[in-house]
Amino acid sequence: MPWIQLKLNTTGANAEDLSDALMEAGAVSITFQDTHDTPVFEPLPGETRLWGDTDVIGLFDAETDMNDVVAILENHPLLGAGFAHKIEQLEDKDWEREWMDNFHPMRFGERLWICPSWRDVPDENAVNVMLDPGLAFGTGTHPTTSLCLQWLDSLDLTDKTVIDFGCGSGILAIAALKLGAAKAIGIDIDPQAIQASRDNAERNGVSDRLELYLPKDQPEEMKADVVVANILAGPLRELAPLISVLPVSGGLLGLSGILASQAESVCEAYADSFALDPVVEKEEWCRITGRKN
């Protein structure tokens, strides 16, 4: 049967309240969607973790009078009269198949492909990482992920050790291993990210070469030939003293999760320890790379 979709944009903090409001207004289901395609892992029991900028989408029966729905929502203290929203009529489709059909193998650099598990790899001789959207990296189109994957693809990682600082799903560590690294180390503050990385590594046959740690458990004397950190500008600046000691002398550093407008301040935090390359930009995001002095 056809459906009607109503979409609201809000903050992660307000998403639950607006979800309840949509349900009270007659929605049969609610979906939270990141406005900017940033990955979020399964929450811990009793915890709902959402993005800072979240779309709350309510699905309504096709017979619903949406004028009545809007009138109800206008009384909500977070919305008010004339609140911004988008209403769409959805066709009757096989939604699971429709969702899967939206995702295709993606190429990063010259050798590397990221492929959903239900798709055939486009090149058997390429470096293929099998990761599904959602658990792995949202839709996989976020510029910071792309920038990091392209950088790793450009390197000769043969027999190298790579640290993925803030590993999330493990996509960067796994890609490094598939690109020839002898060992990768993933570090993340989120136990759910550690589990996601472990599962993805097993799926790609590299779990025997991937070490995973929460910060409290990581070895004190830990070094790598290549360190990549795709987190955010604030933590990259604050953690610069810790991250800067991870590469060996002459080792490489790659940083992303940084808006282009934040590049200068992040560069300043690392300039004393690294010979930095020109900043590479993609859309509004950027990547900073350099070699350890």
UniProtKB/Swiss-Prot annotation:
Source organism of this protein record: Escherichia coli O8 (strain IAI1)
Any matching Pfam family: PrmA
Gene Ontology MF terms: protein-lysine N-methyltransferase activity
Annotated S-adenosyl-L-methionine binding sites: T145, G166, D188, N230
Name recorded for this polypeptide: Ribosomal protein L11 methyltransferase
NCBIfam families reported in the protein's UniProt record: prmA (TIGR00406)
Listed EC numbers: 2.1.1.-
Sorted UniProt keywords: Cytoplasm, Methyltransferase, S-adenosyl-L-methionine, Transferase
Presence of the UniProt keyword Ligase in the record: no
PANTHER family in the cross-refs: ELECTRON TRANSFER FLAVOPROTEIN BETA SUBUNIT LYSINE METHYLTRANSFERASE (PTHR43648:SF1)
Family: Belongs to the methyltransferase superfamily. PrmA family.
Compartment list: Cytoplasm
Reaction(s) this enzyme catalyzes, per UniProt: L-lysyl-[protein] + 3 S-adenosyl-L-methionine = N(6),N(6),N(6)-trimethyl-L-lysyl-[protein] + 3 S-adenosyl-L-homocysteine + 3 H(+)
Function: Methylates ribosomal protein L11.
